[in-house]
């Protein structure tokens, strides 16, 4: 479980990592989570109908997205896809940042307030930060309405910036950055991009999201 693969770019991307071993029933095998992301529309594309938000996919549908686009030396990706009994399709959508969250004694939090593309591990993370900020404001005392407005003013601009950053790939935008410089591939990453350039992309996102290491 120490290895994670994130490959491809913003148009096609593979996320792959082992979860657990089952040495009793399936020796040498691992329960593995894999995701194939494919950009199939843009900001003008209508949001899918509700019935399409979680549907079973045909294996051939996924293999077509992978063919000639994604591969890893770590394993046989087409074989992994074929071996997966149930494959599901989920649309990846977000919403434009809202102008207001708090209305009187009612406010929004988490995905209800800032649905965003699932990159950078920020869906639940930002909801936790929302909850902490809201609890801090309410614990400070004073009118509830004022506490909710203060929470709104603290969290809404921060999460709006993350929504916008995730549209550009979030921290995984480092992959697109390298691909743009070396579209035909490379054998020496340092010859394509300086380590400081790559660290800056990831570090800027960590600071934006609020989980950069302190110190």
Model-predicted segments: where are they?
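FAD-dependent flavoprotein oxygenase/oxidase catalytic domain
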Residues: 1-215
């Amino acid at each position: 479980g120490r290895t994670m693969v994130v490959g491809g770019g913003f148009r096609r991307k593979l996320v792959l990592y082992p979860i657990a071993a089952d040495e009793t029933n399936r020796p040498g095998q691992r329960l593995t989570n894999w995701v194939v992301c494919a950009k199939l529309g843009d900001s003008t594309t209508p949001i899918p109908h509700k019935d399409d938000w979680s549907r079973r996919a045909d294996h051939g549908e996924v293999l077509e997205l992978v063919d000639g686009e994604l591969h890893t030396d770590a394993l046989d990706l087409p074989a992994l896809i074929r071996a997966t009994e149930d494959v599901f399709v989920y649309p990846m959508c977000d919403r434009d940042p809202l102008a207001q969250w708090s209305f009187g004694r009612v406010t929004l939090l988490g995905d209800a307030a800032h649905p965003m593309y699932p990159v950078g591990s920020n869906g639940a993370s930002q909801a936790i930060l929302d909850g902490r900020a809201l609890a801090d404001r309410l614990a400070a005392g004073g009118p509830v309405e004022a506490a909710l407005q203060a929470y709104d003013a603290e969290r809404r601009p921060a999460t709006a910036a993350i929504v916008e950053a995730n549209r550009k790939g979030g921290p995984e935008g480092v992959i697109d950055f390298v691909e743009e410089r070396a579209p035909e591939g490379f054998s020496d990453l340092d010859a394509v991009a300086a380590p400081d350039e790559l660290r800056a992309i990831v570090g800027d996102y960590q600071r934006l999201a609020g989980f950069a290491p302190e110190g």
